[in-house]
Amino acid sequence: MIVCSNMVSSFFYFSPSKKLVLVLMEKEQTVAPGAGLIYGLNDRPPVKETIFAALQHLLAIFVAIITPPLIIAGALKLDLETTGFLVSMALFASGISTFIQCRRVGPVGCGLLCIQGTSFSFIGPIISAGLTGGLSTIFGACIVASSVEMLISRVLKYTRRIITPLVSGIVVTLIGMSLIKVGISACGGGAVAQANGTFGAIQHVGLAALVLVLIIIFNRSSNRYLRMSSIVIGLVIGYITAWALGMVDFSAVQSYGGFNIPIPFRYGISFDISSIIGLALVYLITAIEAYGDITANSLISGEPVEGETFVKRASGGILADGFNSMLAGFFNSFPNSIFAQNNGMIQLTGVASRYVGYFIAGFLIILGLFPAVGLVFSLMPEPVLGGATLLMFGTVAAAGIRIIASQQIDRKATLVMALSFSFGLSVELVPDILCQLPDTLRNIFSSGITTGGLTAILANLLIRIKE
């Protein structure tokens, strides 16, 4: 039986990394099926209650959705208009994905109150793809590689023998470790500060530290709503402080009005094999994560977690996870995944009705259609975002360690971890080790996530030790 981690009391509750923890965790506190529900899966709450529940879910996911495009745009040094559009499309695509997941269109979707949003797990490989060939290469790789997750949904029981909790934990840890350098770079002021010589200035580092400390303070509050909103509060106060220091200029927002038109392939599409392979590995992991998230959601919603109904629900949810990521690529956005923090929100509100998901989807789509929304967040100074993401990325790595720790660490597991972390971190710390390889191989293995993840899969399959 899958269990619901008690990490809700820590940073993992709100951050997107929380979804990484519900994969196949063992030895955590269990949750009684459907305990404390006011409205079940197919109930229709009154409109006012539905809207209120939807807004609470929206609060828990909004920052998580807009942060990946902001980080990717910053790393690729994209202009303000492009960054704003990517943020808007992330909201729009998340709305479409959430509707499909909740509604279940044919075999696609789980039919639960399951919220999807832009995934943190893909940031590293996406940045690598963007540096290789720009946005067209990113979206091409996202679309093609998503077929891996859709295929896994059809052969799920076999895949779980390859992507074990140990392998998942290693990959999740590497994802967090590889992203920490992105977060600390933002704390110093990002690419703009590096270009103008102000990187590491006291105002940048101090602003990032302020946001970080505020998040910690509010996260430790005994008030559950303050705890859930800790990242939002930290970012808002940091943003206001940056404005007071003259670090924000809102004049650009005034020149953008009207609506965003979600034009497919606005930035073109191209294909790079190394980028596709790098993203495909992450899709393998997110498929297994989606299985855990759907199981936990079913349990909390009082639905079966075994039998034919559950198998169809899990397969449909994973299929939707891949399909929605492909759809996001069509609409100039990045891969989506299920947000497990919303499972905690179901417990808090007692509302498991999937009809709430329709309202959440509608809110996200509407927000994505207004350019000013994306632009306001695009103007957020990098140190403000860096203070929050540094903590988020650290929790991703910590979540991976917890997944590993839930398993028996025998001689084989020790060897698998040693090889995976050694190879994965080596190419991150000393990228020149690959300088003599052909371009295609160098691009594939330059990502620590890809190198370490493939090493973990192969080592776990091939190493045999008699205890």
Predicted regions and their residues:
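Intrinsically disordered, low-complexity non-transmembrane regions of multi-pass membrane transporters
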Residues: F14, K19-A53, A252-I263, L299-G316, ...
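N-terminal signal-anchor module of multipass membrane proteins
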Residues: E26-L113, S121-A129
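Hydrophobic alpha-helical transmembrane segments of multi-pass small-molecule transporters/permeases
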Residues: T50, A54-L58, C142, L166, ...
